[in-house]
Regions:
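Active-site loop/lid in soluble adenylation, ligation, and acyl-transfer enzymes
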Residues: 11-133
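Intrinsically disordered, low-complexity regulatory tails
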Residues: 1-11
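Signature for HUH/AEP ssDNA processing cores
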Residues: 100, 105-172
Length: 172
């Protein structure tokens, strides 16, 4: 049966140049996925993931102690920024806020070190804040919504967008 404990492992504790504190901390309980395992996974898919998230302002879901513990959304950064990242100043009402932007795999793994479990990109690039080039429809079904209904919704949405000559693709 699945447990909340990951098997004890020796070995790599630095991933993409980022030292991982608590590398054996379980972030996802079943099956047990540790911070180190997640960092290694993102390092392995960085070439495919970075073209979609690098250079875009981010909103992050942070769960420093893993799923099931206290989580919070972070949009703004003031002081600490992991290597491989920078901030972009974006005006908001009467102030200017700093948003995180990933540059490379080091930044991606640096966010795992901070307990980031979800990356939500803006629909624009950091150098074209007022010119979105991407629109995302996030289909998060409620607990009582059957998967077949989600699929039907996605197919209907795709058909309507393509009728408007908009290119669509699935992103998970």
């Amino acid at each position: 049966p699945p447990t909340d404990k990951a098997p004890a492992r020796k070995g790599k504790r630095t991933v993409a140049g980022i030292h991982l504190s608590h590398p054996d901390r379980v972030l996802y309980p079943a099956p047990a996925i540790t911070k180190e395992t997640l960092a290694q996974f993102y390092e392995s898919i960085a070439d495919r993931m970075l073209p979609h998230i690098a250079g875009r302002p981010l909103m992050l879901l942070r769960c420093p102690n893993g799923v099931g513990s206290e989580c919070f959304h972070q949009k703004h950064f003031r002081d600490y920024m992991p290597k491989g990242m920078h901030t972009v100043d974006i005006p908001e009402k009467s102030t200017v806020r700093k948003y995180a932007v990933i540059e490379n795999v080091t930044g991606l793994v640096g966010l795992v070190q901070l307990g980031v479990l979800e990356f939500h990109i803006w629909g624009c690039r950091e150098d074209e804040i007022e010119k979105p080039d991407r629109m995302i429809f996030d289909l998060d079904p409620g607990p009582n919504v059957p998967w077949a209904a989600v699929i039907e919704c996605a197919l209907t949405l795709r058909a309507r967008l393509e009728a408007l000559s908009l290119k669509t693709f699935v992103k998970t």
